[in-house]
Structure formats: structure tokens, C-alpha cells
A protein has these predicted regions:
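Peripheral, non-cofactor segments flanking catalytic/redox cores
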Residues: 1-128
Length: 128
């Protein structure tokens, strides 16, 4: 990069520190996103457990929407948005645990996880 040819040693050191700090910040954000996905997956399982406890004529849809509405209220998003997030989180956590773990460790971003899940969702297991 020719733009850095005129940079002083102090400026280069500052840039290196900024890059390192941003890398740590990104890894932390990825880790926190994985933690949120884990919590959303648990919330989805809770909704299913609640639905199974009774003989619901809506087959548990009300339980799912109620759990999603509770979460959505504090996150300031709709229950449908939370339902989608819970479904995506359950898929990531249950079907792609190594990807979820890599994201949790900050080795990959949530965007990387989505691409892997999207690409891998259509692949059938050899045992199927």
C-alpha cells in the first residue's frame, strides 16, 4: 500500500494497535452472537416443551408465539422476527454444532456461519 509509505513509525504502531483491537472486538461480537443463538435455541425448545404439555388446538403455535413475543418485547422486534431467529439458531446449534462452536470461539463471524449453514442444509447425511 503506497499510502502507508509516508507513515511514521508511531502511525504504523497506532494502525497495528487499531487492527489488533478491531480483531478482538470482532471475535467478541461473534462470540456474543453465538451465545445469543444458544439462548434462542433454548427458548425454542422451551416453547416446544410448553406446547407439548397441553392438548392445544393450534398444535402449540400459541406457545411459540408467546415465548417469541416475550423475547421480542425486550429486544424491540416482532415475535415473528424472534421466531425466525429461534429457528435459525436451533438449526445452527443442533445441526452444525462445530460451526456454532467456531463462532463462539470467535474464529468465524455470524456471516460465515450463515453461509455454511445455507450451503450445508441441503446436504444429506450418509446414514439417511
Amino acid at each position: 500500500m503506497t499510502a502507508l509509505l509516508d507513515a511514521t513509525d508511531a502511525q504504523m504502531a497506532t494502525l497495528a494497535d487499531l487492527v489488533d483491537a478491531l480483531q478482538v472486538a470482532e471475535a467478541t461480537l461473534s462470540s456474543m452472537s453465538a451465545a445469543r443463538d444458544g439462548l434462542l435455541a433454548i427458548a425454542g425448545r422451551l416453547a416446544i416443551d410448553l406446547a407439548k404439555q397441553g392438548n392445544h388446538p393450534d398444535r402449540g403455535d400459541h406457545s411459540l408465539r408467546t415465548v417469541a413475543a416475550e423475547i421480542g418485547a425486550v429486544q424491540r422486534v416482532s415475535d415473528r422476527t424472534i421466531e425466525r431467529r429461534m429457528a435459525a439458531a436451533e438449526l445452527l446449534v443442533d445441526q452444525f454444532p462445530a460451526v456454532w462452536a467456531a463462532q463462539g470461539a470467535g474464529r468465524i463471524s455470524p456471516a460465515h456461519s450463515r453461509v455454511i449453514v445455507d450451503a450445508g442444509s441441503g446436504i444429506e447425511s450418509p446414514s439417511d
